[in-house]
Design a protein with these regions (language model features):
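Acidic, histidine-bearing metal-coordination/catalytic regions of metal-dependent phosphoesterases
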Residues: 1-118, 123, 134-140
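Active-site neighborhood of divalent metal-dependent phosphoester/pyrophosphate hydrolases
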Residues: 111-132, 137-191
Length: 191
């Protein structure tokens, strides 16, 4: 079955770093291949935790790219190694998934544009959220501040993945080119 089950989400960008998260369906360690060339011919691979199996997770991959240049456009693709884990040191990579889609982002900096959008109280109301995302994609801000209350309650990781990485909207890659900065609200802290 499919290992990667969401588009990437850019998170918490800065002049010299960018976070990228995506959802998985089984034990894996995710990675990002990034570079300044659109075809990634200059690509560098960065794993969750920096190593192949140290940041194994069955739900969400979070990769932090560091040492980036300010005000620079980078191209990237996500991937994940499927990991079999017995116990202790009984673990091995048993497969790989790397979608072909290449996305891009621009780091913050003096030469980068500096406008943003704010959304809040989205509460998993998908029809309204889809309209908001459509407008955000039309405007094309340098970032979006998601100012809390993504839902009514987030009681488990499955709900969190749906609220943030897999919203029920047609623009499944809504955050693959525009970074989001989260500010949790009172509803995000319940459960």
């Amino acid at each position: 079955h499919t290992l990667i089950d969401s588009a990437p989400m850019l998170q918490n960008y800065a002049e010299t770093s960018m976070g990228i998260a995506f959802s998985v369906t089984a034990n894996a360690n995710g990675y990002v291949i990034y570079g300044e060339m659109p075809d990634l011919s200059d690509g560098t691979k960065v794993y969750c935790g920096g190593y192949r199996v140290t940041a194994m997770n069955a739900d969400v991959m979070q990769i932090r790219l560091t040492g980036l240049k300010p005000s620079t456009t980078y191209y990237y693709r996500i991937g994940a190694d499927r990991i079999h884990y017995g116990h202790g040191q009984n673990m091995k990579i048993i497969g790989n998934e790397e979608p072909a889609q290449i996305y891009s982002f621009r780091t913050a900096g003096k030469e980068a544009k500096g406008h943003f959008c704010v959304v809040n109280d989205t509460h998993m109301k998908w029809k309204a959220f889809e309209k908001e995302i459509g407008k955000i994609l039309e405007i094309g801000p340098s970032c979006v501040i998601w100012n809390g209350d993504t839902c009514n309650t987030l009681e488990n990781i499955k709900d969190q993945k749906i609220a943030i990485l897999q919203p029920k909207i047609s623009q499944h890659d809504f955050a693959a080119r525009i970074p989001y900065l989260f500010s949790p609200g009172n509803h995000d802290s319940r459960g």
